[in-house]
Amino acid sequence: IPTNWKDDVLLENYAYGHMSQGKAPGGWVMKMSPDGKNREIITMGFRNPCDFALNRDGELFVYDADMEYDIGSPWYRPTRINHGISGGDSGWRATSKKWREYFPDTVGSVVDVGPGSPTGVIAGMNARFPTHYRDALFICDWTFATMYSIHLKPNGSSYIGEKREFISNSDGSLALTDVVIGPDGNMYFCVGGRGGQSYLYRITYTGSESTELSQLDTTSEHAKARATRRKLESFHGSANGEALGVAWTHLGSEDYHIRYAARIAIEWQNPKFWAQKAYSEKNDLA
C-alpha cells in the first residue's frame, strides 16, 4: 500500500448510523511471515471482510460486506467479490464518503452479490466436484442462507465473475458460517449463530461428470497480462531504480489493473525523480 493516502474527502460527509466515524483504510488484508516478524498490508478499502481465498492462478479474492444503513441510498454498495491486487484500494469509506465505481484510483468489484452477510470463502480446486466447480470460488452468506459458486472469467490482467446459487434453504435456517474442502475431496460447512441450532454438513458429489482439473492457463493474452501486472507489483513496497523505466510506459495501458499497478509502483518512488515527467505527460490515461 502506498504511504501517501489520507482520510480525505472533497464533498460534505453525510454521517449517520453506526460506524459513521469509521476511518480509512477500512478493512485490509495483510501478508506476514510464518514467525510474524515481517508484516505488510497488501490491499485495503473494505467494510467487513471475514474471509478470502486464492484461486488456481494465485490471485486473491475478498468477499466484502455491505452496510445495511446505506440500502436505498445512492452510495449503497452490495456485498461483492473484490480482486485483492497489490496496492489496491477498494474504496469503502463510512457513510457517503464511499468511493464511486468510476473513480480512477479504486479497484472495482469482480461481481456484485447483493445484500447479505459474508462469512466463509474457499476455492474449489481441491474438491472432488465437476471440473467447472474446481475452478470456482464458494462463498457463504449468513443472512440469506445461501452458498454461491463464483465462476471467474479472465478479463485482461483481472477477472469478471458470475454468481450461481449452489445451496440454499428457503426458510432461512441455514445460517452459513464457514466452509472447507476436506482431504477426501468433499465439502464441509457449518451453520449457526444468534440463537440458532448449529450443524456441520458434508456435500459429496456422486454423478458421472468429469472431476479432473482443467488445464491451467499460462499462455493466453490474459496470462501474459497477469504476468505484466505482477512484474509491476514487484516494485511495490520500496524504492527501486528500475521502477520508473518499467512502469511509466504502462501508465497509459488499456488494461485498468495494469495501469493501477504501474501507478502504485511509481508512487513508491521519490517524487523528485518523476514529478516533472508527470507534468509533461501527454497521455490522458497516464
Give residue ranges: language-model regions:
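Beta-propeller domains with acidic blade repeats across secreted/periplasmic ectodomains
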Residues: 1-235, 265
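N-terminal alpha-helical segment
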Residues: 25, 243-244
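Buried hydrophobic core positions in alpha-solenoid tandem helical repeats
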Residues: 49, 244-248, 274-278
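Short amphipathic alpha-helical patches
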Residues: 104-108, 274-275, 285-286
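Glycine- and acidic
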Residues: 106, 132-133, 246-248, 256-258
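Structural detector for internal amphipathic alpha-helices that build alpha-solenoid repeat scaffolds
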Residues: 225-239, 249, 257-269, 276-280, ...
